[in-house]
């Protein structure tokens, strides 16, 4: 009898212990997805906020892989081209959509969007929807944040140097300002311009300079123009400006290096993505919050020269987790997520540039007062169908929408980098680039 009582008591303890364990051990996520992202500040914020605000509610665990821009592009291309299926969600932009839509490399989102009215497609800027849709008019990627390009500068340093930056500057005015604001004694470069090789690194800003100088990669009938006078003049100006007044080790500086330099007070001016405000105006990251001025992308022969881009999420064609992938994408690209970032991290950090609603938000408008008009104006003015002074063979401001452009742009950027370091002249670099461009053009000439 005593043994029986002891057995019952022990059993009761075991059952209670198991029950307690079940209550205290976190439940395993119902599903897991793998997401590949570029290592920009907005994505790092997303990684930080996901577990507590998405996984907790959805039960979907998100495994992030974050890479520098050039490495990301290579990794995404390899994964979707081979159908490896290592990632469910990949980070791409308008260039990739133009080349991959309808190929099976990435999935159409139309049915998912139609079944998810809370995502509110109508709130997304038409330029973002159009840029992330294929020729079949189907949407292939959801924009996380959108951007154009603009000039950013330290107001206090400009005042100290006796410089006035116009709201709509020319590149000649920018060069003159960089000369006056360059302060090597105090470790401050007059300007930062991307020199890191890569079609989406160095040649993102540089192609906009080419455009406004009157140049183009190709004419409408596919005549290569890489060593034409306007192209050479633009690249010569860019390289000369960097060599005289630019950041140290220019060929190692991409977006990340320039944004860090600007935030840490090592750079007086910077021409780059409008989305950089999420970093340089972010309390805790930037040492100079509230000290920046903003102007439209500098011009020479065109009325505007800002680019148009979106970092966006797409579902890899080989993914077997389409539903869970969309749940994550829908949440991350929603106005609800923008509000979450605004409340948790500050409105300057919100991934803007894609939804009309955030530009009507009073708290956002208050925080973004210094750059609100320039950013919104730049996004509205950007015209991928007419970015220069002549007709083009494809749409795109800072890229040519053909698969070969990624390799072409990167190869030419490597030659330009050699010119930046004095290993060859700009003309020599672009003569080499012309030969490469002619090979691409030959595939498309009729």
Question: Model-flagged regions — what are they?
Answer:
Residues 61, 159, 383-446:
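Conserved C-terminal helix/tail region of periplasmic/extracytoplasmic solute-binding proteins
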Residues 177-180, 220-252, 293-297:
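Glycine-centered hinge/linker elements that transmit conformational signals in sensory
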Residues 31-32, 52-124, 159-166, 259-261, ...:
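Extracytoplasmic "Venus flytrap"/periplasmic binding protein-like
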Residues 30-41, 60-65, 88-89, 140, ...:
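Short, well-ordered beta-strand elements
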Residues 114, 275-288, 301-410:
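C-terminal lobe and pocket-closing loops
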Residues 94-148, 202-205, 289-295, 373-388:
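Hinge/lid segment of periplasmic solute-binding proteins
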Residues 135-144, 149, 172-224, 260, ...:
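Extracytoplasmic/periplasmic solute-binding protein
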Residues 78, 86-90, 117-157, 189, ...:
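A structural signal for short loop-to-beta-strand junctions that line the ligand-binding cleft
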